[in-house]
Amino acid sequence: MLFKMRSFVAFVLLLSWFGSCCSLKDQAVDFLKSEDSLKKDLSSDEDSTYLKAFGFHRKTLVRNPYKDLPSRKDRKNRVVAATTTPSSSPEPAPKHVSTKASTVSEPQKRSSTQDVSPSPSAPLANSPIPRNSHSSVPLVVGCVGGAFFLLLVATGLYFFTSKAGKTVNPWRTGLSGQLQKVFVTGIPVLKRSEIEAACEDFSNVIGSCPIGKLFKGTLSSGVEIAVASFATTTAKDWKDSTEIHFRKKIEMLSKINHKNFANLLGYCEEKEPFTRILIFEYAPNGSLFEHLHYKESEHLDWGMRLRIAMGLAYCLDHMHQLNPPIAHTNLVSSSLQLTEDYAVKVSDFSFGSSETETNINNNTVIDTHISALNPEDNIYSFGLLLFEMITGKLIESVNKPDSVDSSLVDFLRGETLAKMVDPTLESYDAKIENIGEVIKSCLRTDPKERPTMQEVTGWLREITGLSPNDATPKLSPLWWAELEVLSTA
């Protein structure tokens, strides 16, 4: 929602800027028009003044200035006539005078007309002033082009951010050249038909879990996935409370995002046929429980066990430092999966508030005797797992020492850990007793007296010298490769 609001504000600001550009363009055009009009008016005034001066000089040169003056002979005749008889009417002026004047002034008229002809450089009154039409083109093109480009950018950002929080579908199984964590912007919704094809029509069953059956799937790219399918097959058996747990589980798993965690990659929900499925990263080397307690499984040496312990510690420390902290709900050796290079992948297939009841209904065989609800419970479970990895003995709890083995009670009473080491281990570190002290601090009866996972991780790193990078899977099937997801329209 926040992305949409930001995009909308950016879009409004862009429109406002575009309107300002258009207004600026109109003002610039009006200014150019007024400038051309002013030039034209000034030119017209100059031409008018020039023509007036030209007319005045022309009239002055054409007129004979001596036309009205009497000649000497006329003055003499007038004197004689005045002395003899007064004339009743004045005699007209002799024609030769005006003729002479006309004769004299005609060349002057022609000469004056030729002399005052306007110069070629002077602007003519009737010739229009050419307008500089090219001066406004760059301004208009720049404003329109820039506004159009920014409009495209804003539109693209709006549609991109509006889809950022949505789930995506369908799921293309190809690989791209760059890592992308699909759970960063939302867990994708996958089609049942795609999962069905990857799991060979759900025939490749690899086990069971509190959710239901666990399948192995292989994408067209060769990437392997783990598919956990809920046992419920009808909508009437799927309660509203169960749906709430389902969505909370997806939300919780999507926040973990750690290299030593079996991350959630997608989920499927369909009405016909009724389907609820979770898709996880797959670790091909089975569980820690199998390697510790089944002779047929690959033997884990001392270095491999320490690496598994450190990967688990780093993952739990990451989960506990989230806001709010996330505690693993079923932290046992059967929930720790191993990759090709025997790095740990912490899986969490538990579901609902009562996992024991879920397991009974689904006839599953996974260990669910511990249901941790807070980080302090995870610290206790981590201490039990450390003891199990070193001794090879399965211990349920300090409160149930007779259920499997009493060695844990003996250890807590002062027995050295070196005397309890798994007999299949050919060698082990001399600092094993230091690890024993860490185990004892994790198994304190009062949860408030137990150390934090951050403190435990720091102690073990100092003892083993293994960094987070040392405990990270080197060939993680989906961490270094990306599942390319196409968003729906």
From Swiss-Prot:
The protein kinase domain is predicted to be catalytically inactive. Disulfide bonds: none annotated. SUPFAM superfamilies: Protein kinase-like (PK-like) (SSF56112). GO terms for molecular function: ATP binding; protein kinase activity. The chain crosses the membrane at residues 140-160. Residues 1-23 form the signal peptide. This is Inactive receptor-like serine/threonine-protein kinase At2g40270. Residues 161-489 are cytoplasmic. Residues 24-139 are extracellular. The keyword rRNA-binding does not apply. Residues 81-90, 117-130 have a biased composition (Low complexity). Its main location: membrane. Residues 200-460 form the Protein kinase domain. Residues 67-130 are annotated as: Disordered.
